[in-house]
Structures are given as structure tokens and as C-alpha cells.
Amino acid sequence: MEHAVGKVTFKITLTSDPKLPFKVLSVPESTPFTAVLKFAAEEFKVPAATSAIITNDGVGINPTQSAGNIFLKHGSELRLIPRDRVGYCE
């Protein structure tokens, strides 16, 4: 009997676009979240190197975890933002 691989689904919204488009991505729980970030950025045609993912509450997410851990800690609704808006203060 094959072991079923658990998947998690994220709804990622692009906050830099006024229309707030979103993508729904389903990935295996063990997927590195850096790969999810990169794929989401490519789907929205924004540079992954200058993008970050935050929660709907504005909490930054460290992408060096598995997708399963991110899902358990932060849920399924996330936001993709340009990194120049992270922690910026005048």
C-alpha cells in the first residue's frame, strides 16, 4: 500500500496590484517554502528575489521552513509583497 503524500493549499494574494489578484497553490507538505515563494512570484510575473510572503495580519514569514509548517503556523491565506515594503520606516 502506497503512503499518501499530504498536501497543503495556499491562497496567495498579490498586494502590489490594486486588483488584488490571487493564486491558489497546492503543494506537498514537505515542499520547501522558498520554492512556493519562487513559484508564486513567477506566476504573478514579479521577481522572487525581491518578494516576501506575509500573513493577512502583516506578519512576515521565514521561508526556510516546509510548506506544511507554514500552513500549520499561519493558515492558508497569505500575501506576496515587494520586499522594499518590509520593515520600512521613515
UniProtKB/Swiss-Prot annotation:
Family (UniProt): Belongs to the UFM1 family.
Residue numbers covered by the propeptide annotation in the UniProt entry: 88-90
A Pfam cross-reference name: Ufm1
Lineage top rank: taxon: Eukaryota
Keywords carried by this UniProt record: Isopeptide bond, Ubl conjugation pathway
Cited function: Ubiquitin-like modifier protein which binds to a number of as yet unidentified target proteins.
Keyword presence, Electron transport: no
Annotated transmembrane regions: none
Protein name per the record: Ubiquitin-fold modifier 1
GO terms for cellular component: cytoplasm; nucleus
Cross-link (Glycyl lysine isopeptide (Gly-Lys) (interchain with K-? in acceptor proteins)): 87
InterPro entries with a match to the protein in the record: Ubiquitin-like_domsf, UFM1
GO biological process, one term: protein K69-linked ufmylation
